[in-house]
C-alpha cells in the first residue's frame, strides 16, 4: 500500500519533533518576553491535603493543601525527575529549582487544580534545570481537595488526590 506524500509529511514531521510547542495560556500565565521554551515535562502523582482548621475561621474545618508529590516524565514517557514541596523540581542529574507562584488561572477542565506561572527563586546544580527561570503548570487533571470527609474525627489526617499536569520550563534566550 502506498500513502501519498502529502499525507505522510505530517507523520514524518511529528516523529522528528522534539519539544512540543508551548500550550495556549491566558496572558497572565505567559513567561517573560526574554525567555524561550526548553522542555515540557509530564507529572503524574498526588496533591496532598490535611484536614485542619481554617485560618480565617478556626471553628470550621477544611482540606488544606500541603504539598505535591509527583514523578516527572519527558515527552517519550521516560522518568526524568521528581516534583515536590516548595514547590521544587529535581532532575535525575541533581539539578533543582524551587519556585514561587507568580500568577494563577482556573483550569479549563472542572475538577482540576489551577494552572500556574512560577518563577525560580533558587536554582542548584548543573544540568537539566540549571538555566530554568520560569515554569508553567498547565493541562491539569484532578488534584483538587476532597469535597467532604474533613470532620473533627479526621482532624490532622491527610488525603492524597491523584493528578497529572504538564510543567513547561523556560530559560533566558
Language-model features, listed with the residues they occupy:
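C-terminal motif of bacterial Sec signal peptides marking the signal peptidase cleavage site
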Residues: 14-15
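Catalytic core of nucleotide-sugar-dependent glycosyltransferases
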Residues: 11
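Assembly/interface hotspot detector across virion components, adhesins/toxins, and nucleic-acid enzymes
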Residues: 3, 51-53
